[in-house]
């Protein structure tokens, strides 16, 4: 059973949750949506509001959905869904039906898509986006290590509008 929680009460280690356990970033509605696995991002506070920060490369199909919609979701799963997250991160929704291929149950919530199987879901209202620029890096090694194709991430900031978690 899902219940709403205050984002400040998320019981997990946020660095482990995002970088090790991964998350699905989704945008759209159940008529037309896409999701992708991400391990780069963060949660915190900006402009006095609990917020999420995600980073999406320009070639990712999910970027089109993030641009076209005002909300997006971040969904976190238990280890039993690791294979679905691996698949969502390795196959593009341009040529793979993620609705049926991931084995997850998508539903509309708060203007975007979440998954019934997620143990934690954040619905975020998009408030800011900006492309990373090579001239802004203070550590040039990051450019050679991560951006040899000059495919710099676009950062999105979303204010957390709703947060639901499984009952403990």
What is each stretch, according to the model?
Residues 1-38, 42-168:
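Active-site-proximal mixed secondary-structure blocks
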């Amino acid at each position: 059973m899902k219940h709403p929680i205050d984002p400040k009460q998320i019981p997990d280690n946020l660095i482990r949750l995002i970088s090790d356990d991964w998350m699905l970033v989704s945008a759209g509605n159940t008529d037309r949506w896409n999701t992708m696995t991400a391990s780069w991002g963060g949660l915190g506070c900006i402009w006095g509001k609990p917020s999420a920060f995600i980073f999406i490369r320009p070639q990712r199909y999910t970027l089109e959905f993030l641009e076209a919609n005002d909300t997006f979701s971040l969904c976190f799963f238990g280890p039993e869904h690791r294979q679905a997250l691996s698949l969502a991160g390795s196959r593009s929704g341009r040529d793979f039906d993620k609705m049926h291929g991931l084995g997850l149950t998508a539903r509309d919530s708060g203007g975007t898509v979440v998954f019934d199987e997620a143990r934690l879901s954040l619905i975020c209202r998009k408030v800011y986006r900006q492309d990373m620029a090579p001239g802004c890096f203070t550590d040039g090694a990051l450019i050679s290590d991560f951006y040899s194709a000059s495919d710099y991430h676009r950062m999105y900031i979303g204010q957390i509008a709703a947060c639901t978690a499984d009952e403990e």
